[in-house]
């Protein structure tokens, strides 16, 4: 369970930077 909680807590850390890159890419594209 502890490993699962760690994995879940690590998801936002990976998705947030990816979302920022996507937003930046879209902004540059337009």
From Swiss-Prot:
| Entry keyword set | Secreted
What does the tissue specificity note say?
Expressed by the venom gland.
Subcellular location(s): the record lists: Secreted
Single GO cellular component annotation? extracellular region
What more does the entry say?
Answer: The mature peptide does not contain cysteine residue.
Q: What is the recorded name of this protein?
A: Conopeptide Vi002
The source organism is Conus virgo
